[in-house]
Amino acid sequence: MSYDIAKIRADFPILSREVNNKPLVYLDNGASAQKPQAVIDAVTRGYAEEYANVHRGLHFLSNLATEKYEGVRAKIARFLNAPSEDDIIINSGTTEGINMVAYGWAMPRMEAGDEIVLSIMEHHANIVPWHFLRERQGVVIKWVDVDANGDLDPQKVIDAIGPKTKLVAVTHMSNVLGTVVDVKAITAGAHSKGVPVLVDGSQSAVHLPVDVADLGCDFYAITGHKLYGPSGSGAIYVNKARMAEMRPFMGG
């Protein structure tokens, strides 16, 4: 398949600028993607023509904003092949999504000595929340190393699961190496031991077709700004069983 690179670049206004008298070349999409004109236009239109509180009013603009908001939830559910729109929690990104799981699901059911299994290739968004839980409740983090090629062996993750393990939390694709992790195999092995699985899908959702129904994971977190969407946007898929166990981690 061939791509018209000039046409693709033309979709991104920022790529028309120059840096040091040369056309801008941006190679940091792994951290955050630039925004195409369609996204910029949609955000501008939202503030200029459609803005109001979501789920907080009965007037025209509030109903319109709510309809748009719920439309996004439906699109995310289809994008991830979630069984239901009710499985999608919209948030500010993967970091908030993982914190939702840490404080709204893990903290109420974990005590000192309980274990969380992580790989050493995790992004800080999938490390720091668990360190906070370790400091607050004395949970134990078990680390699984990668091989010489930077690959994560699913069996090593499964073997790390013990009788006190309460959660496995792994990335689907490394933000540093680009390594793709077989989270379907990890999920199957973890579930055979009665342990839920959280997947950090920040990178994989951009590059791979994601089917949470096929993967079987309990949680799958994504970030909008890496998917060419606005900053401060994201979502987490939570399966029906885990959703019933979730508690709000913020109030107001």
Where are these regions (language model features)?
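Pyridoxal 5′-phosphate
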Residues: 1-252
